Amino acid sequence: MQYQKLILFLNWRIGIVLKKLNYRFKNMDLFKRALTHSSKSENNYERLEFLGDSILDFLVGEYFYLNCNDDEGKLTILRSHYVSENYLVKVFDALCLQDDVILGKSYQGEISKAIKGDVVEAILGAIYLDGGLDKARKFIYDNFDLKNYKNIIDDNYKSKLQELIQGNFKGKIAYETVPCEGNQGGFEANFYMDE
C-alpha cells in the first residue's frame, strides 16, 4: 500500500513539472535525466546541459537576429544577458523547479546558481532531443522574456570604455584590478593606455 502511494505521488509530481514546462515528453528517461544531478547518478544531466547550452545560444541569437535591427555588438550583449547564469536562475525559479532536481545524498544545502542554470539548459537539451528544434524554440519563447529586450541595460562598463577608447585613440589598453584593504570583495580598477 505504501509503495502504491509513493508511485501515485511521484506520478502526480511528474505531472506538475511537465505542466510547468508546458511540454509532454515522449521519452521520459530524457526528462528524468535532465533533472538528475551527478551526485545522484552517472546517468545525469551533464551531457544534456552541454547540448542545451549550444541550442540556447543558437535560438536566442536567432531570435535577436530576426527581431532586432541593432548592430552585432548590441545583439551580442542581448544574447549574453539571456544566456547568462543569472538569467537562467530566474527561469529556474519562475518554473519553481527547486523541489524537482534529483540530488544524491552527498549533496548538502540549497541548490546552487550553477546547478539551477545547468538544469534549465539540460531541460532545453532534453526537449530538443525529444521533440526537435521547434519545441525547443517554443520552450525558450514561453520561458525567456525575449520580447522585453529593450529593457536590458548594458552594464559592461569595461567594454564601453574599451569601445570609446578604441574609437577615438590608437594605442594599447591595459587593466589592473587592485583589492581594496578592509573592504571584503571590493576592488579598484585601474586603466592604462599606451599612446
Name these PLM-found stretches.
Residues M1-E195:
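Double-stranded RNA-binding/processing signature
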